[in-house]
Design a protein with these regions (language model features):
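Active-site and adjacent substrate-binding regions of carbohydrate-active enzymes
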Residues: 1-444
């Protein structure tokens, strides 16, 4: 397959399908709703859509917990709807990126259902199982969503690893059969006609096989980062993926690589590396100085933001390609975060940030609603939040006495992922033109 660099001239628009456009009045966005808005997206100047996961899922983490890699989630539509989306988008010169979630599956995936049945089940080694240590977890790692990163399973009296929710068990990439299953699935979707992959937490698929304790860093659990992020076989796995799948198609790839350095980004995305086209780095959106990660009310330092952006522009130039983003489904709204969402300054802030984004070298990623200057929702009651991360951390940190409830609620208002997940505001009506029914989450 002749490969081209078409992605260097692309403008990518991220759709969070649950919140984009509901076509049937059930309060949940869907594929026909996306098709309905393709002309709007073309007029906007978009030529690539990255659509967050639309595959079968119990929705513990809004689709990032996949239970079947070859079926469309029923509330979003059917495979026929998805094929029509591909056809209609391609007619308009718009390409489609699939969100590839292969660090973990849902615990309702058939592989995991089989894996937990017995220690000698053929699927046992599809996941990461360890014996208890002194009757407790195999090590002190904490999950990215709060609580321990290990879940005890009484069926076989062992623990399985989940770096995210307990309903998101990590796949064992050391197992060649797992890797082949993933590559077969990727080839299936490429044959359907998709144009590439955004790879969810892809830098976490290779783990240090000694599973040592992590540093506590003032929290309740140890940090898994040094042992699971940019792990010992990560580049070997991605080069194998390139040989088995990516080199066969003229597709675009971008990897989510939390904590990546300039040097590491060159390994992932250097043109001679045969791995990825680009990565998402998060240095410009990382919180500094909090014992509890992002849960703080400290204001962002805009001068520091500019320094980070300049550094990545200058030091990656000619070595690897930059991805450019200010927000996504995991971040607060960029206008509220980096600008000023006071009505007097919201529009000016949004235009300033858009100018910043589109005038740098790299591929820009616009998150749905960013083009309208959408702001944080500032929900002030816990029951208004749907995000598993927000709810679990609120409970964990307040129950442990590490944060006062009022302060933690202020943190949620500023930092919760739900700020980005309120329905797209198509008009100024009560339900924002998103749905005729009751929206799954409150309208901003």
């Amino acid at each position: 397959m002749k490969k081209t660099d078409w992605w260097k001239n692309a403008v990518v628009y991220q759709i969070y399908p649950r919140s984009f456009k509901d076509s049937n009045g059930d309060g949940i966005g869907d594929i026909p709703g996306i098709i309905e808005k393709l002309d709007y997206l073309k007029e906007l100047g978009v030529n690539v859509l990255w659509i967050s996961p639309m595959l079968e899922s119990p929705q513990d983490d809004n689709g990032y917990d996949i239970s079947d890699y070859r079926r469309i989630y029923k509330e979003y539509g059917t495979m026929e709807d998805y094929e029509k989306l591909l056809e209609e988008a391609h007619k308009r010169g718009i390409k489609i990126l699939m969100d590839l979630v292969v660090n973990h599956t849902s615990d309702e995936h058939n592989w995991f259902i089989e894996s937990r049945k017995s220690k000698d089940n053929p699927y046992r080694d599809y996941y990461i199982w360890r014996e208890p240590v002194n009757g407790k977890e195999p090590n002190n790692w904490g999950s990215a969503f709060g609580g321990p990163a290990w879940e005890y399973d009484p069926q076989t009296e062992m623990y399985y690893l989940h770096l995210f929710s307990r309903k998101q068990p990590d796949l064992n990439w050391e197992n060649e059969k797992v890797r082949q299953e993933v590559y077969d699935m990727m080839n299936f979707w490429c044959e359907k006609g998709i144009d590439g992959f955004r790879m969810d937490v892809i830098s976490m698929i290779s783990k240090d096989q000694s599973y040592p304790d992590g540093e506590m860093n003032g929290g309740l659990y140890g940090d898994f980062g040094p042992y699971c992020v940019h792990g010992p076989r990560i580049h070997e796995f991605l080069q194998e993926m390139n040989r088995e799948v990516l080199s066969r198609y003229d597709v675009m790839t971008v990897g989510e690589t939390s904590g990546v350095t300039i040097e590491e980004a060159q390994k992932y995305a250097g043109e001679d590396r045969n791995e990825l086209n680009m990565v998402f780095q998060f240095e410009h959106v990382e919180d500094q100085g909090s014992d509890h990660g992002k849960w703080t009310t400290e204001k962002y330092d805009f001068q520091e933001f500019k320094k980070v952006m300049i550094k990545w522009q200058e030091e990656l130039a000619g070595k690897a390609w930059n991805s450019l983003f200010l927000g996504n489904h995991d971040q607060p709204r960029s206008v509220s975060r980096f600008g000023n969402d006071n009505p007097a300054y919201r529009e000016t802030s949004a235009k300033m940030l858009a100018t910043c984004l589109h005038m740098m070298q790299g591929t820009p990623y616009v998150y749905q609603g960013e083009e309208l200057g959408m702001t944080n929702a500032y929900f002030c009651k816990l029951e208004d939040y749907k995000d598993i991360e927000s709810i679990q951390y609120y409970t964990e940190l307040t129950d442990a006495g590490l944060m006062e409830p009022d302060y933690m609620m202020k943190c949620l208002m500023l930092r919760s992922r739900d700020n980005a997940r309120t329905p797209m505001q198509w008009d100024d009506s009560e339900k924002a033109g998103f749905t005729d029914g009751e929206p799954w989450i409150k309208i901003n």
